[in-house]
């Protein structure tokens, strides 16, 4: 089976024969090339056709001809802005900035606006300062004025760290405001304005309320040197030992002489105040031993010889080992990271790097097509290779050589062994099928997504023996309960509604991992960490509340680089099938780990696979499950290893479903 259908390969051949000039091929072939992403930069004459095919094609046109509303739609459908979309967005930046607050929000999230842009937006009253601050307070580094009500409203909606940043950019901040915010929202008043507070009792209350936040550094100097204040803080520190508050210790060190601190705290003074103190470990009291062990990281850094001797002492005396400990004891406020970015993480051996290497090699020596095919083999069956090749800076002759190779790629049909089981390599075949038929599949899914499955009269539902929700009354502690819930989930999916977050993780299945180079380093047992408190507990009528239409599902928003995604429809069809596989894996994993049920595993796996097919209206197909599935699933649970054979079985299931939906079965 070829990667591309015959008509797409023919259109690509025509494009190659025209030296990659898409304007010189027929309109029929142009539409095919657009549908399959077989193009590079596009001419003005194809604007409407390209935008109708996929809104993100807007980035491949000269910026001066692009409609601003199309850029907005493209930004809304992206999670990362690549160099092409960034270029057209910056070209039309002024128009985008006055296109409404939602567009401004997108531009901020994509880092398309400078500090001066934000200042202009506020000064010209295009958007309110509070709106921008709620998006990302750290973007604003110039002074602003807000009313008390606006400040309080902001504090309710932004993180603590952002509030502290807000204090630094307000012209009209006063003591009453930060004290009120501390009382009502428990945000530390760490601002110079706090030094105006002279009430010693209130100062003590604030310091002891926020011992980790260094409020002590902003206390009025007269209060800091008050004997009563010093004694109260020292008593507080002593009361909480062996827990240490570095900021308070630094304060005590600044107001009490070293000799007095050493006399009172002895070996503790090394960790608390970074003072020098020598002692024999045999003389340590039990309280001192506990303190040293809890704070061993301080001794590792400040008195390593003592720390090593203490470890040896505990090993000999108590036959246990004190591990290395490290870490900053002071809480630091971390700035929230945007879910969107203009930064693309580049692989060390990206396609562009390899193409450049081939191009340079051709200039210096003869390079055979076999050599090129071998070098780019790791990108075999990647549907975006053609587009990325045409967008690259390499010589046109090198581009044509690569395109000829990609045009004739076939899906692999050789057999391979997975833990002694001979299976066919089905994933490439399935991905090729999806590439061939993704528009038909997407058309079907969107045609049924608004139908209520309990009363749906589509051809698939009419063929079912049971058309209502099975899991309305079910016991998820039993196999029947799990299968009933899986049946309902799958029926919803077939009607265009999916749960991308079933186990608390998105898109961890094999299709998105392989197709979009989403290398999940986490083991499966780590991915399933929250399965006990996830949507796996939802059943019956409550299932629908956890679902989203396939048309609203994350597609480009899932991936690091939009250049790695062919188009929106293709990505969503991949997500649809990937989600069904996730349902299968999660159901089996839940039975094994949460219910601790390992009886008749092979039989249960078979039931899961056939339940999914039945829910999709495929009633007369059979998937044979090998006995060795039980050993593989034990390894999956115990070691988190990828269940290759189970993936193979699941991919066989979605291949059958795909063929059935497409009418090619």
UniProtKB/Swiss-Prot annotation:
Keyword Cytoplasm: no
Signal peptide span: none
Record's keyword annotation contains Transmembrane: yes
Localization, UniProt: Membrane
Chief subcellular location: membrane
One cellular component (GO) term of this entry: membrane
Transmembrane segments: 573-595
InterPro entries xrefs: Poxvirus_E2/O1 (IPR021155), Poxvirus_O1 (IPR006732)
Domain of life: Viruses
Induction of synthesis: Expressed in the early phase of the viral replicative cycle.
Membrane-topology annotation of the record: Single-pass membrane protein
Keywords: Early protein, Membrane, Transmembrane, Transmembrane helix
Protein family: Belongs to the orthopoxvirus OPG074 family.
Protein name (Swiss-Prot/TrEMBL): Protein OPG074
Species in which this protein is naturally found: Monkeypox virus
Source organism phylogeny: Viruses, Varidnaviria, Bamfordvirae, Nucleocytoviricota, Pokkesviricetes
């Amino acid at each position: 089976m070829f990667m591309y259908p015959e008509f797409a390969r023919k259109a690509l051949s025509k494009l190659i024969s025209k030296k990659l000039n898409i304007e010189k091929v027929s309109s029929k072939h142009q539409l095919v090339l657009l549908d399959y992403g077989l193009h590079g930069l596009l001419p003005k004459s194809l604007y409407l056709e390209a935008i109708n095919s996929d809104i993100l094609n807007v980035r491949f046109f000269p910026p001066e001809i692009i409609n601003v509303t199309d850029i907005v739609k493209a930004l809304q459908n992206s999670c990362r802005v690549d160099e092409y979309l960034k270029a057209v967005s910056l070209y039309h930046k002024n128009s985008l900035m006055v296109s409404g607050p939602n567009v401004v929000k997108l531009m901020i999230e994509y880092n398309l606006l400078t500090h001066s842009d934000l200042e202009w937006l506020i000064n010209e009253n295009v958007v309110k300062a509070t709106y921008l601050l709620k998006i990302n307070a750290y973007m604003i580094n110039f002074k602003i004025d807000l009313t008390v009500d606006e400040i309080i409203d902001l504090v309710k909606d932004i993180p603590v760290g952002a509030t502290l940043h807000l204090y630094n950019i307000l012209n009209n901040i006063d003591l009453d405001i930060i004290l009120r915010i501390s009382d009502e929202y428990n945000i530390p008043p760490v601002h110079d304005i706090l030094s105006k507070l002279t009430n010693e009792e209130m100062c003590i209350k604030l310091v002891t309320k926020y011992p980790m936040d260094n409020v002590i550094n902003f206390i009025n100097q007269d209060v800091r040197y008050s004997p009563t204040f010093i004694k109260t803080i020292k008593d507080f520190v002593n009361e909480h030992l062996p827990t240490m508050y570095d900021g308070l210790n630094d304060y005590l060190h600044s107001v009490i002489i070293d000799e007095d601190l050493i006399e009172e705290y002895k070996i503790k003074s090394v960790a608390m105040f970074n003072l020098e103190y020598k002692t024999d470990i045999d003389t340590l009291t039990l309280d001192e031993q506990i303190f040293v062990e809890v704070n061993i990281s301080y001794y590792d850094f400040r008195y390593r010889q003592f720390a090593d001797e203490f470890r040896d002492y505990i090993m000999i005396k108590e036959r246990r080992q004190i591990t290395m400990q490290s870490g900053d004891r002071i809480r630091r406020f971390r700035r929230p990271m945007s879910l969107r970015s203009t930064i693309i993480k580049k692989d060390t051996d990206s396609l562009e790097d390899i193409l450049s290497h081939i191009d340079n090699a051709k200039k210096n020596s003869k390079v055979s097509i076999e050599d090129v095919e071998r070098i780019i083999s790791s990108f075999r069956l990647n549907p975006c290779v053609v587009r990325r090749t045409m967008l690259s800076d390499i010589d046109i002759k090198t581009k044509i050589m690569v395109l000829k190779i990609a045009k004739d790629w076939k899906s692999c049909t050789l057999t391979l062994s997975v833990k002694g089981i001979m299976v066919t390599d089905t994933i490439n075949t399935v991905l090729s099928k999806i590439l061939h038929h993704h528009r038909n599949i997407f058309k079907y899914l969107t045609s049924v997504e608004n139908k209520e499955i309990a009363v749906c009269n589509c051809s698939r539902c009419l063929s079912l023996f049971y058309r209502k929700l099975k899991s309305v009354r079910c016991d998820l502690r039993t196999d029947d309960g799990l299968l009933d819930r899986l049946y309902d989930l799958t029926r919803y999916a077939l009607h265009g509604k999916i749960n991308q977050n079933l186990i608390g993780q998105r898109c961890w299945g094999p299709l998105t991992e392989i197709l979009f180079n989403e290398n999940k380093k986490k083991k499966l047992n780590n991915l399933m960490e929250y399965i006990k408190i996830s949507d796996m507990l939802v059943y019956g009528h409550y299932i629908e509340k956890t679902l989203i239409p396939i048309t609203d599902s994350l597609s480009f928003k899932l991936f690091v680089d939009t250049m790695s995604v062919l188009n929106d429809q293709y990505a969503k069809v991949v997500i649809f099938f990937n989600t069904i596989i996730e349902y299968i894996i999660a159901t089996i994993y839940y039975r094994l780990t949460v219910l601790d049920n390992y009886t008749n595993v092979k039989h249960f796996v078979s039931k899961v696979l056939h339940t999914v097919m039945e829910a999709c209206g495929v009633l007369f197909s059979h998937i044979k499950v090998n006995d060795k599935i039980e050993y593989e699933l034990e390894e999956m649970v115990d070691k988190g290893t990828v269940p290759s054979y189970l993936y193979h079985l699941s991919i066989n299931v979605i291949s059958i479903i795909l063929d059935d939906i497409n009418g090619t079965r």
